[in-house]
């Protein structure tokens, strides 16, 4: 495909032929194995130069059929609970398996011990409740910290250091807990903090300084320190030198193994959502197009965050002559992807391609309004596409009840 749009989210489409594009069903997710590999190579370089270990946070990307593409580059997986931990164990059994959850369930913890080798607790009370069993099972035990250092602007929903946050343990909470349970420090092998969201290494440096100021006295006794996720390492222009300095200085100063657990960095710009225009209409001065994809169902972060995803050959409002608002077919009035400008009006049946659609899409989509789940396809480095999985009516129905025998 000859692309006039050379932005990073669409770089992998150069090997996709128009014939292959036309053969894809819509809507569909298309995973880009070449870009996954390029991201993996960059992250492997960081590990080789610093000695850190980088995990895949499956909450952002858990399409296990392409785990073999990433396997040569990652140290293991990070899970948010039992199912993700099991998935990592099943699909990457030789890799490390880390898990963090805001609160573990007593009826699941024994099974979790079968999969995870590193278990991070959110609070001293959870550490006291489950830590002894984890240690007895030979697991490496950690505690998530809240360094009370906010570096985000405009995304409070993603800020674990916001006032009143339920995520992580503050120094005051830790000190009070140790007074009550003096045995807690002996349970810990490592510490964990996760405070970033799509940020550069300067935010990490600020956060790391706050961690040292509040918890530095604990670090010499630790085996590892997990810097969490939110590091946009594979984004063009990311400050790799600053990241690597943070890693190497921390490991040298405290003698710990540093872990990172990004999700987006592994699959950044490594996926597309192909969609078709179903209808066009005019409401006053607003031109609209109804697509066969739904922001609410297929790209929920567009509404939750919110953000406006990149669209192939489209521009910002005012950049090109025709401004069109793109929306989905559901009954939700706010099921809108955003306003885009085009060189010419859109027409019914026209195909559009959204970029950077591998992350927080297939793992978060839903069937509101009975919307079908889009099939998931993969494209290799030669531009050859293959179907990984498709969904139908039974997938919609089975989530809502049990069919009669």
Language model: regions and residue ranges:
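A short small-residue
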Residues: 18-24, 190-194, 228
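Feature marks short, surface-exposed loop/turn motifs that line or immediately flank catalytic pockets
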Residues: 149-151, 197, 233, 266, ...
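Active-site-proximal beta-alpha core segment in soluble small-molecule metabolic enzymes
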Residues: 49-224, 246-249
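Charged (often Lys/Glu-rich) extended helix/loop segments that serve as interaction or gating elements
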Residues: 246, 257-405
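Charged helix-capping and loop-helix junction motifs
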Residues: 205-210, 239-245, 275, 341
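N-terminal capping/small domains of soluble enzymes
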Residues: 2-104, 108, 294, 342-355, ...
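Glycine-rich beta-strand-to-loop/alpha-helix junction loops that act as flexible
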Residues: 194-196, 225-234, 262-265
């Amino acid at each position: 495909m000859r692309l006039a749009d050379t932005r990073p989210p669409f770089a992998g489409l150069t090997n996709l032929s128009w014939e292959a594009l036309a053969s894809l069903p819509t809507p569909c997710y298309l995973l880009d194995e070449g870009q996954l590999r390029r991201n993996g190579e960059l992250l492997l370089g960081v590990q080789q130069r610093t000695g850190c270990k980088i995990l895949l946070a499956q909450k952002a990307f858990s399409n296990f059929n392409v785990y073999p593409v990433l396997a040569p580059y990652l140290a293991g997986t990070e899970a948010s609970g039992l199912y993700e931990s099991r998935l990592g164990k099943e699909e990457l059994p030789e890799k490390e398996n880390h898990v963090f959850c805001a609160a573990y369930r007593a009826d699941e913890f024994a099974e979790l011990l079968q999969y995870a080798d590193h278990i991070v607790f959110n609070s001293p009370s959870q550490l006291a409740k489950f830590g002894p069993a984890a240690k007895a099972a030979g697991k490496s035990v950690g505690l998530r910290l809240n360094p009370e250092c906010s570096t985000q602007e405009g995304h409070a929903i993603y800020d674990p250091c916001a006032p009143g946050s339920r995520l992580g343990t503050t120094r005051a909470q830790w000190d009070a807990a140790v007074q009550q349970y003096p045995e807690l420090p002996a349970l810990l092998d490592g510490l964990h903090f996760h405070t970033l969201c799509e940020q550069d290494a300067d935010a990490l440096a600020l956060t790391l300084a706050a961690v040292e100021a509040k918890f530095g006295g604990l670090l010499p006794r630790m085996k590892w320190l997990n810097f969490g996720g939110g590091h946009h390492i594979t984004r063009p222009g990311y400050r790799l030198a600053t990241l690597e300095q943070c890693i190497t200085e921390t490991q040298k100063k405290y003698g710990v193994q540093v872990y990172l657990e990004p999700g987006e960095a592994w699959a950044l710009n490594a996926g597309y959502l192909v969609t078709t225009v179903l209808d066009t209409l005019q409401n006053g001065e607003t031109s609209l197009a109804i697509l066969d994809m739904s922001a609410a169902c297929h790209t929920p972060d567009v509404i939750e965050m919110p953000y406006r995803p990149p669209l192939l050959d489209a521009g910002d409002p005012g950049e090109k002559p025709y401004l069109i608002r793109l929306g989905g077919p559901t009954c939700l009035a706010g099921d809108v992807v955003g306003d885009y400008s085009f060189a010419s009006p859109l027409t019914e049946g026209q195909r559009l391609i959204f970029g950077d659609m591998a992350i927080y899409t297939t793992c978060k989509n839903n069937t509101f309004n009975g919307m079908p789940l889009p099939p998931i396809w993969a494209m290799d480095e030669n531009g050859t596409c293959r179907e990984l999985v498709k969904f139908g009516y039974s997938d919609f129905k089975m989530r809502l009840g049990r069919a009669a025998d």
